[in-house]
A protein has these predicted regions:
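Hydrophobic/aromatic-rich core segments of domains that either
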Residues: 111-181
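Short, well-ordered strand-loop elements centered on a beta-strand within folded domains, enriched
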Residues: 34-38, 100, 104-106, 154-160
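Secondary-structure boundary elements
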Residues: 42-101
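Conserved active-site-adjacent core of cysteine acyl-enzyme catalytic domains
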Residues: 93-103, 107, 111-118
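A generic structural signal for nonpolar/aromatic side chains embedded in well-ordered alpha-helices
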Residues: 10, 81, 101-102, 180
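Linear, non-domain "peripheral" regions
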Residues: 1-56
Length: 181
């Protein structure tokens, strides 16, 4: 359980490590070591190729917001997601990672929150990923993921998924800000 918790938290803190989506482990009674065996989203040989593509994509997107204030950077990332990412109702595996929203233009809340974090990290804006669990007693069937950002020393919640899925439009004037700060 402890190894799972560490791996899970590492993936939230570093969503740029999008290719390792799980793990198994081996333990031999005669050895003091635990063997960690990562599970990959795609073939191990393709990791470097996808990593290079994602790094370039993040740099290209972030470059356009350099020199803006923290709030303007947050809004830029929010608007980019709302204009360029569609919610993946099929919930493909890559939609849970940055490669879905930033590479394929589709994502679920987890992938969208990870993409927001990676972009804000690249822009120097403090950001973490927040998760709420399901609660069948209150009718909440699924877990949800969003971001918490620090702008001007104050903390705000940012949910680009909900703003994205509430009113889908490609027009800048139609972007919703119901879950923006």
């Amino acid at each position: 359980k402890e190894l799972y918790d560490i791996f899970f938290q590492m993936r939230l803190d570093h969503p740029e490590i999008f290719w390792a989506v799980g793990f198994s482990w081996k333990y031999y009674p005669d050895s003091p070591n635990l063997i960690f065996v990562p599970e990959y989203l795609f073939e191990k040989g393709k990791i470097k190729e996808h990593q290079t593509a994602m790094t370039s994509r993040v740099e290209k997107i972030a470059r356009q917001a350099q020199g803006l204030s923290e709030w303007e950077k947050e809004k830029y990332v929010h608007d980019f997601i709302c204009q360029n990412v569609h919610y993946d109702k099929l919930k493909k595996a890559y939609s849970h990672e940055i490669i879905g929203p930033l590479g394929q233009g589709v994502g679920v809340c987890e992938g969208i929150a990870k993409a927001v974090k990676v972009l804000l990290d690249a822009l120097g804006v403090w950001c973490v990923i927040a998760i709420c669990g399901n609660n069948p007693e209150k009718g909440i069937k699924y877990r949800h993921t969003w971001n918490i950002v620090r702008i001007g020393g104050a903390y705000y919640h940012l949910d680009a998924t909900f703003d994205n899925t509430l009113g889908k439009s490609d027009k800048v004037e139609d972007i919703r800000y119901d879950y923006f700060n």
